Amino acid sequence: MTLADMRPGTSGTVERVSGRGILAQRLIDMGLYPGVFVNVVRNSPLGDPVEIEAEGTFVALRREEARFVEVSPQR
């Protein structure tokens, strides 16, 4: 499952960042790397971007970018 697939109020652990180059580095710099716990806070009114919380930091990502972050959902 990717961050783009998750709904507000759901959470999980980042398993993999599958983007390459600048995009992958940008996601890692925002704190999205394997092992990090993330929580989907909300979607914007039009559904894009999505706001997430990663280790106490709030980040807004376009769904296009969120597709590159693979997450293991918390059950």
Which residues make up each language-model segment?
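Compact, glycine-rich, soluble single-domain proteins
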Residues: 1-75
